[in-house]
């Protein structure tokens, strides 16, 4: 029972860290990264469809993304979706592919992105602390129900705290990597 509580908490914390990593991947750092286009939806036959299902996305140069549609007839729809996205990148359509040149970030924009990143980090830490609280509550209920002893409860609480500390350290590590990436010119 005790190991199950810790394992469940650890798995949930890993999911929160995975979500954080995806969110940080969507923050544009002045370099081309295919994950920038993950959230772009193209209206295809009346239904919003993820761009990566309609086109291949390649990185021919450090600051250029190239979108090659599988079906050339939807080139205009893809271009429209890219214009309407909140990426702040103007697509260049050459008739068969769309090129996205990632502009260099200004110092002010870098600082804004670091602030945005801080919000993602904080929400991940809140999620981790909520998972810890849930695990601690479950452990205390188990002790009240006489499923574990008081000594086992203390050990379990220490294990849960260690898992939580490790998850918070990982979130901080991810944050420092992304911040370094954002602030490097």
UniProtKB/Swiss-Prot annotation:
Recorded GO molecular functions are:
ribosomal large subunit binding
Question: What keywords does the record list, in alphabetical order?
Answer: Cytoplasm, Protein biosynthesis
At the top level, the lineage of the source is Bacteria
Annotated signal sequence range: none
- Report the family membership: Belongs to the RRF family.
The record, for PANTHER family, names: MITOCHONDRIAL RIBOSOME RECYCLING FACTOR PSEUDO 1 (PTHR20982:SF3), RIBOSOME RECYCLING FACTOR (PTHR20982)
Protein name per the record:
Ribosome-recycling factor
- Species this protein is from: Lactococcus lactis subsp. lactis (strain IL1403)
Q: What is the lineage of its organism?
A: Bacteria, Bacillati, Bacillota, Bacilli, Lactobacillales
**Gene name tied to this protein:** frr
């Amino acid at each position: 029972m005790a190991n199950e509580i810790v394992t469940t908490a650890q798995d949930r914390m890993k999911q929160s860290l995975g979500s954080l990593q995806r969110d940080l991947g969507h923050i544009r750092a002045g370099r081309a990264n295919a994950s920038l286009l993950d959230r772009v939806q193209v209206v295809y036959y009346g239904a919003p469809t993820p761009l990566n299902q309609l086109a291949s996305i390649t990185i021919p140069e450090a600051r250029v993304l190239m979108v090659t549609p599988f079906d050339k007839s939807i080139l205009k729809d893809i271009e429209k979706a890219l214009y309407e996205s909140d990426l702040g990148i103007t697509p260049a359509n050459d008739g068969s592919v769309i090129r996205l040149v990632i502009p260099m970030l200004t110092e002010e924009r870098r600082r804004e992105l670091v602030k945005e990143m801080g919000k993602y980090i904080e929400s991940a830490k809140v999620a981790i602390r909520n998972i810890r609280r849930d695990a601690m509550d479950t452990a205390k209920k188990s002790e009240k129900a006489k499923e574990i002893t008081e000594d086992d409860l203390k050990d379990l609480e220490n294990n849960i705290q260690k898992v939580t500390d490790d998850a918070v350290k990982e979130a901080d590590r991810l944050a420092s990597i992304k911040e370094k990436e954002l602030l490097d010119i």
